[in-house]
Amino acid sequence: MAVVTMKQLLDSGAHFGHQTRRWNPKMKRFIFTDRNGIYIIDLQQTLTYIDKAYEFVKETVAHGGSIMFVGTKKQAQESIAEEATRVGMPYVNQRWLGGMLTNFSTVHKRLQRLKELEAMEQTGGFEGRTKKEILMLTREKNKLERSLGGIRDMQKVPSAIWVVDTNKEHLAVAEARKLNIPIIAILDTNCDPDLVDYPIPGNDDAIRSAALLTKVVASAVAEGLQARAGAGADKAAAEAAEPLAEWEQELLAGATTAAPEAAAGEAAAPEQS
């Protein structure tokens, strides 16, 4: 069964590109035609590229990797948070803070501070402080939550990132490329395909298109997680099998050696009349 159908792509408006005067010539090979001054994206190619991206994401996650979801434009914010949360992956849907990837050690310290403030609030750590101190701590916590909440459980840089609108998320793209982190992204007609490892030609401005393609990536993550869980269960079952004691191993080795000798003896014995 196809990951997504042509009808779903058409219904979401994934085929609509930008106006013909706002385009990147490198995207020419992904364009089917133009109508009324708007480029129409070749959805047949989109389907092919979706399959490639889906397989990459699934395999990456199955082997223990993680995918960061990035989309801070209004049209993408909701679906980015919703789909990433559904599959337990980190996401950025507010503002990309410089160094989120390239200076993760510093970002990780801010995450620790966020958790520290949350723990203080929940365990009564704010009690006994002045109203001004409580207000300052609460503001600090809310600010950290807003900017870092989506990556609160991220322990290291992701294995790959999913991006909605590479032009808007140019900082995230630049950091990922600097660290050689693979980029999966929607490629609208004004984007640069050379910056993306796993492109999906499509409309990155329509809410439904961004949501559909983000859901596809999340589904690939979910399938990868299932494969990872299955592999883990098989490994656990193998490790759980109780090893043979030394005397049992010797007995088994003796039985294995004795069997061929007995068979040879029977073959050499003369028949009795």
Swiss-Prot record:
Alphabetized GO MF terms: structural constituent of ribosome
Tree of life domain: Bacteria
GO biological process, one term: translation
Pfam families: Ribosomal_S2
Keyword entries, A-Z: Ribonucleoprotein, Ribosomal protein
Database matches in InterPro entries: Ribosomal_uS2, Ribosomal_uS2_bac/mit/plastid, Ribosomal_uS2_CS, Ribosomal_uS2_flav_dom_sf
PROSITE patterns: RIBOSOMAL_S2_1
Annotated SUPFAM superfamilies: Ribosomal protein S2
Gene3D superfamilies reported for this sequence: Glucose-6-phosphate isomerase like protein, domain 1, Helix hairpin bin
GO CC list: cytosolic small ribosomal subunit
Database matches in CDD domains: RPS2
Record-linked HAMAP family: Ribosomal_uS2_B
Family: Belongs to the universal ribosomal protein uS2 family.
Protein name stated in the entry: Small ribosomal subunit protein uS2
Species name: Mycolicibacterium vanbaalenii (strain DSM 7251 / JCM 13017 / BCRC 16820 / KCTC 9966 / NRRL B-24157 / PYR-1)
Upper classification of the organism: Bacteria, Bacillati, Actinomycetota, Actinomycetes, Mycobacteriales
